[in-house]
């Protein structure tokens, strides 16, 4: 049985058994103490269905027995609020002040709930349990509880603040610097992420990008699209020339050969190679634990500053620009933790210089798009000013690789240097300095180090 079907069936059994218990209690067939005991057994039997993953931290949350009982108690509390709310609703378009006050009562506030029971003369009544049962009519009740959890998480985001040191103009200059790099495709990837604020896997593989106008790009196919999300595409503002961005995306996909990679492998590559370089380059500029996914959050903040209409609320802007449903504001609150601490007008040239230095320190190999034709290779072999014996041997190895694959043009993609080293070792029985190979390839493929 598929896991989703099994969980749905388990939910249904749980709901029915819970309803049987409360109906017995309402009909005086069970005492309150007996009810509590039965609830404990029920929670024990069904706690497995309450295992789930925290969407905010991606860590597994185990709702154990005590937590399961706590959920049940909180829903009893919620049923008290629900009954009073229904009793005080007179017209569908008008809500009394009392109902507005009920909205501010937490379902965990047992003291307040007891006050409500007393003030509404519900002490000796069991009828409010019927409202509790109503909350369990479908498995939606767990989603409702997850919503309460989500609100608590949003409130925690309000308290947590992470300050971003750079200003808007520095941000734009960083994007220009990264997009125009020819040393490593990872640098262009960071520039694209900062310029458009999309998910890494959308840039790498999943989505299609088109120029909307000189300041906007249209994206089709949204990753992590929820079933009820009717948004299939999104148009958003960008911090660089749309044509340059789209060409960079094509180059990234070509260099990484992502059409042959699964989403899982792409994520694995991001976690290691891409995140490591990102943290090296932006050390002490962004928080040390940040990764390439941080680019999405910082885009949201700076795009609001640069592009949002006057008086538009920030959470609404973030939701809109990311292509989320209007009522799905959790991500917006998550990104709102980041506070732009520097509102100066001028770009920080010293920081840009530092980034340039770090790029030349940490990026020691060529990994952007270049090509070599067989004609150029033949001319290089015939040239008289040969650097050394290893250089000419490298040219011969490359020629043999092209002949083996029947290629007239060889592209300098990521991993080619490793392929050349393996072929060199197989042919000549030894290898030479890796940095020297990088120097040779810059001459052969005609690019600057």
Curated annotation (Swiss-Prot):
InterPro entries: ResT/TelK_cat (IPR032047), ResT/TelK_cat_sf (IPR038280)
CC terms in the record's Gene Ontology section: cytoplasm; nucleoid
Function as written in the Swiss-Prot or TrEMBL entry: Catalyzes the conservative, sequence-specific DNA breakage and reunion reaction that generates two hairpin telomeres from a replicated telomere substrate. Breaks two phosphodiester bonds in a single DNA duplex and joins each end with the opposite DNA strand to form covalently closed hairpin telomeres. In vitro relaxed-circular, open-circular and linearized plasmids, but not supercoiled DNA, are all substrates. Cleavage is position-dependent relative to conserved sequence elements.
Note: This strain of B.burgdorferi has at least 12 linear replicons with covalently closed hairpin ends.
Top-level EC class: hydrolase
Native organism taxonomy: Bacteria, Pseudomonadati, Spirochaetota, Spirochaetia, Spirochaetales
Keyword field: Cytoplasm, DNA recombination, DNA-binding, Endonuclease, Hydrolase, Nuclease, Plasmid
Protein name stated in the entry: Telomere resolvase ResT
Signal peptide (from-to): none
